[in-house]
């Protein structure tokens, strides 16, 4: 009997073709490419992106995003730790399974990140935006500029935090970018974390976020009604609630079309808590919300999140560590123009759960929805991303699963570990070169 061939994303034709012709400017960028591009290329192929789009997307990633990922992470080097993953790595792929759309998120890092010039990585995002804006029509920074000014630290704030030693083990990430890939084009989004601004000003994250968005409503009054409804729900939980605002995001497009999303972290990991997030404590009770609630309950039964109180863990996990933890729940609320109520999206925090069982639950959900291609390819894709891993024991591939329901249609996305994929474990890429080319990216402080 012949052996069963294991799918392997390092065999991707697009990845191999591009790799044959690249001259990397430094060793760090070479490592980032060979660590992440095999999985990226395979995900695009299986999702049905045409060949031209695959090359364009990976070309943009190679030339305009990888230069902003910083030094390549190892267990011993000094690097900027990003909130994006529990391992502090600044890049993550995700897949909208209902629409077969790929997205990636990254925290831009440059040579000043973590140095006295930019100790909390406030400024590097501007350089990253300068690289992306010429590549895609329609990018608009009006909302971003407003929210960033209100919710991230300036140089004076940074000096105050450092002089008074206020940060400690606090998360230092303040902003990230995400590209939703539609054909060969992309829609740009930003995520903003106000935790450091809260430390610097003494104001709560809730106060900072809602005050900033209310000021945004002065020029965009069509967003005020859903914002007020969300604030009333958050306030109704009281000062000792296990749920609290954590971050927000917005689309970097025409302000009249941009959506603002406010994210709530819920420490109480139970189906009842998730149902409360979904219905905003019963405030959302229309037919669409209730239909989505039934699917949410179905997903809960399939994924089997263990119930309990979960603080967000500190510190970051060391690379290579097998997680023995579970994260809190999360939800976001989209503020749509001219809608009275926000639209919920909930997150099943699956990091630390057995990935095989999570995949089994997802495939069952896909089959019940009639997403036959996704159901047939999903497990093979996971094996292709990490062909040398023990697929029976993995518990760190699925970081989150998000779920929303709009106009009779469920939307589900998976957020996946995207680091050292394909043949990386048996390659020479991770072996330090004897005399590496000097990187133009310095090792930032932690």
UniProtKB/Swiss-Prot annotation:
Alphabetic keyword roster: Alkaloid metabolism, Transferase
The keyword Transferase is assigned to this record: yes
Pathway(s) it belongs to: Alkaloid biosynthesis; ergot alkaloid biosynthesis
GO biological process, one term: indole alkaloid biosynthetic process
Enzyme class: transferase
Binding locations of L-tryptophan: 83-84, 92, 193, 246
Catalytic activity field: L-tryptophan + dimethylallyl diphosphate = 4-(3-methylbut-2-enyl)-L-tryptophan + diphosphate
GO MF, one example: tryptophan dimethylallyltransferase activity
Binding site for substrate: 103, 189, 191, 259, 261, 263, 345, 347
CDD domains, per the entry: PT-DMATS_CymD (cd13929)
Transferase keyword on record: yes
Stored InterPro entries: Aro_prenylTrfase, Aro_prenylTrfase_DMATS, DMATS-type_fun
One Pfam entry name: Trp_DMAT
Highest taxon, organism lineage: Eukaryota
Enzyme Commission number(s): 2.5.1.34
Family: Belongs to the tryptophan dimethylallyltransferase family.
Subunit architecture: Homodimer.
Function: Tryptophan dimethylallyltransferase; part of the gene cluster that mediates the biosynthesis of fungal ergot alkaloid. DmaW catalyzes the first step of ergot alkaloid biosynthesis by condensing dimethylallyl diphosphate (DMAP) and tryptophan to form 4-dimethylallyl-L-tryptophan. The second step is catalyzed by the methyltransferase easF that methylates 4-dimethylallyl-L-tryptophan in the presence of S-adenosyl-L-methionine, resulting in the formation of 4-dimethylallyl-L-abrine.
Protein name: Tryptophan dimethylallyltransferase
Organism: Arthroderma otae (strain ATCC MYA-4605 / CBS 113480)
């Amino acid at each position: 009997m012949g052996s069963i061939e294991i799918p392997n994303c390092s065999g991707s034709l697009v990845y191999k073709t591009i790799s044959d012709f690249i001259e990397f400017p430094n060793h760090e960028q070479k490592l980032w490419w060979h660590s992440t591009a095999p999985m990226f290329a395979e995900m695009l192929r299986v999702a049905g992106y045409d060949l031209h789009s695959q090359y364009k997307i990976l070309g943009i990633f190679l030339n305009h995003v990888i230069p902003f990922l910083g030094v390549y992470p190892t267990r011993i080097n000094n690097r900027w730790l990003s909130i994006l993953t529990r391992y502090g790595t600044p890049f993550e792929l995700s897949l909208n399974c209902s629409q077969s759309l790929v997205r990636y998120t990254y925290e831009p890092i440059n040579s000043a990140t973590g140095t006295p010039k930019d100790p909390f990585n406030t400024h590097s995002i501007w350089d990253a935006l300068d690289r992306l804006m010429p590549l895609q029509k329609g990018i608009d920074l009006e909302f971003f500029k407003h929210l960033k000014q209100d919710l991230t630290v300036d140089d004076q704030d940074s000096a105050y935090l450092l002089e008074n030693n206020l940060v400690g083990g606090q998360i230092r990430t303040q902003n990230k970018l995400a590209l939703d890939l539609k054909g060969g084009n992309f829609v740009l989004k930003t995520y903003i974390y106000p935790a450091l601004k809260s430390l610097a000003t003494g104001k709560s994250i809730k106060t900072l976020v809602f005050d900033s968005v209310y000021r945004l409503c002065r020029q965009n009054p069509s967003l005020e009604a859903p914002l007020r409804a969300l604030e009333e729900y958050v306030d109704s939980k009281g000062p000792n609630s296990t749920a609290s605002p954590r971050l927000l995001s917005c689309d970097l497009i025409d302000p009249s079309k941009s959506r603002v999303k406010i994210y709530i972290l819920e420490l109480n990991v139970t189906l009842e808590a998730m149902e409360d997030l979904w219905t905003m404590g019963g405030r959302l009770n229309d037919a669409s919300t209730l239909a989505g609630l039934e699917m949410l309950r179905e997903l809960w039964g399939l994924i089997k999140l263990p119930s309990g109180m979960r603080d967000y863990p500190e510190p970051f996990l060391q690379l290579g560590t097998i997680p023995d933890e579970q994260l809190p729940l999360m939800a976001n609320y989209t503020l749509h123009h001219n809608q009275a109520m926000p639209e919920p999206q909930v997150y099943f925090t699956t990091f630390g759960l057995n990935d095989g069982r999570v995949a089994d639950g997802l495939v069952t959900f896909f089959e019940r929805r009639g997403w036959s291609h996704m159901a047939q390819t999903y497990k093979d894709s996971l094996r292709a991303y990490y062909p040398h891993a023990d697929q029976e024991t993995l518990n760190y591939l699925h970081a989150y699963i998000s779920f929303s329901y709009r106009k009779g249609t469920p939307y589900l996305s998976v957020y996946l570990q995207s680091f050292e994929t394909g043949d990386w474990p048996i390659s020479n890429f991770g072996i330090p070169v004897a005399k590496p080319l000097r990187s133009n990216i310095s090792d930032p402080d932690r």
